[in-house]
A protein has these predicted regions:
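Local sequence-structure signature of Cys/Sec-based thiol-disulfide redox active-site neighborhoods
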Residues: 2-32
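Structural micro-motif
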Residues: 57-66
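Non-catalytic, surface beta->alpha helical segment in thiol-disulfide oxidoreductase systems
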Residues: 68-94
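N-terminal beta-loop-helix "entrance" segment that forms/cooperates
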Residues: 48-58
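Thiol-based oxidoreductase modules, predominantly thioredoxin-like and allied folds used
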Residues: 38-50
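Short, low-complexity, intrinsically disordered N-terminal peptides in bacterial proteins
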Residues: 1-10, 34-37, 85-94
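Conserved strand-to-helix beginnings and helix N-cap segments that scaffold or border functional pockets
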Residues: 23-26, 52, 80
């Protein structure tokens, strides 16, 4: 959980170990967020979440999954243009 004085990450990447599509998505999200100045974090769906329960039931068959501002924006093969558009849309609403 991020410290209370820092905003939550705008982009969340849900992954699992040994997933080659997750490796590709991580590289894409890292690059796009760096270029756009957006925060991001990665969540392993096989590890216990904040409530102690892994997220594998919700995300397991879809990984990698990208959410921007809490909205699912892609899964399996992540589209860079959709991620950028979601970040731009969120910035306009701020």
């Amino acid at each position: 959980m991020p410290p209370t004085d820092q905003p939550a990450a705008r982009v969340q990447l849900f992954t699992r170990s040994g997933c080659h599509l997750c490796d590709d998505a991580r590289d894409l999200v890292r690059r796009v967020c760096a270029e756009e100045g957006a925060t991001w974090d990665e969540v392993d769906v096989d590890l216990p979440g904040p409530d102690g329960v892994p997220l594998r039931e919700e995300y397991g068959e879809l990984v990698p999954v990208v959410e921007v501002d809490g909205v699912r924006r892609g899964y399996w093969r992540i589209d860079e243009h959709r991620v950028r558009a979601a970040l731009a849309d969120g910035a306009r609403r701020s």
